């Protein structure tokens, strides 16, 4: 018989840097999960990723206080900022442009995000990422 699910906890945690301080500690402490056990498992799973990159994680907490977790790919906005070499997007994306990004870089990001996106094909996913780039004030070059 399958374990009874008590809760799903969604967090964004820096790769390789999970520790019991907020947001991890309070979110998991409320569910009665062993926080250090999660931190060690998460850090071990994300050690091959770039340290400090925010990684979305969905933690499934069971009634017996055990847990499983699934890591996702980093948010598109974070990958776009990294590719364009900027610190933050534009406050007025239609007026102030903050950087440029090539279509090849967009396709590379779409390939990275393909596992988490529900697009029909890579072209549709690339267009979705392109929309995110434009809303951040990035100019897309061919």
Swiss-Prot record:
GO molecular function, one term: large ribosomal subunit rRNA binding
Family annotation (PANTHER family): 60S RIBOSOMAL PROTEIN L12, LARGE RIBOSOMAL SUBUNIT PROTEIN UL11M
UniProt keyword terms in alphabetical order: Methylation, Ribonucleoprotein, Ribosomal protein, RNA-binding, rRNA-binding
Post-translational modification: One or more lysine residues are methylated.
Name under which the protein is recorded: Large ribosomal subunit protein uL11
Classification via NCBIfam families: L11_bact
UniProt-listed Pfam families: Ribosomal_L11, Ribosomal_L11_N
Source organism: Klebsiella pneumoniae (strain 342)
